[in-house]
Amino acid sequence: MLGRLPLFQLFLDRDGHWEASMRFQKFSFGSIRIDGVTYAHDVVIDRGDVRKRKKKPSKKFRDEFGHTPVSIEEKIPWKCRRLVIGTGTGALPVMHDVKSEAKRRKIALLMLPRTDAIEELKQHPDETNAILHVTC
């Protein structure tokens, strides 16, 4: 585990209500910065915890997809209403079993390019977990 980070920034909206927002400060090819910490690898965001995505269980599918996909054998952060998979520039494959499991669990699964995935996390931080691909 890379450590527990305060991923939510509180601010007042126009009506004087408190809202939470995730603090993604920078991302580029090969890295992402969240709350001042730069990660040079894919990350998993699970209820406020940021950790390295452990791809090893999915590497056996690499030849089939030409890229290490997200497979059901990884530690996927299922405890959420929405799971966002940031596909980098669109290159990260998501295996059918992951899609089926999300449907079985009644979790909204969004597979989006990294920029759109980050925007989605900012809009719904309290009910969304994520896997973010940063290396392509």
Over which residues does each language-model region extend?
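N-terminal, charge-rich interaction modules
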Residues: 18-59
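Compact, glycine-rich, soluble single-domain proteins
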Residues: 52-77
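Flexible, charged surface loops at secondary-structure boundaries
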Residues: 39, 75-80, 123-126
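Short basic, glycine-rich beta-strand/loop surfaces that mediate nucleic-acid
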Residues: 117-136
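Short, Lys/Arg-enriched N-terminal segments with co-localized hydrophobic residues
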Residues: 4-21
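Mid-chain, well-packed structural core segment of small domains
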Residues: 76-111
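Short beta-strand segments
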Residues: 46, 86, 131-135
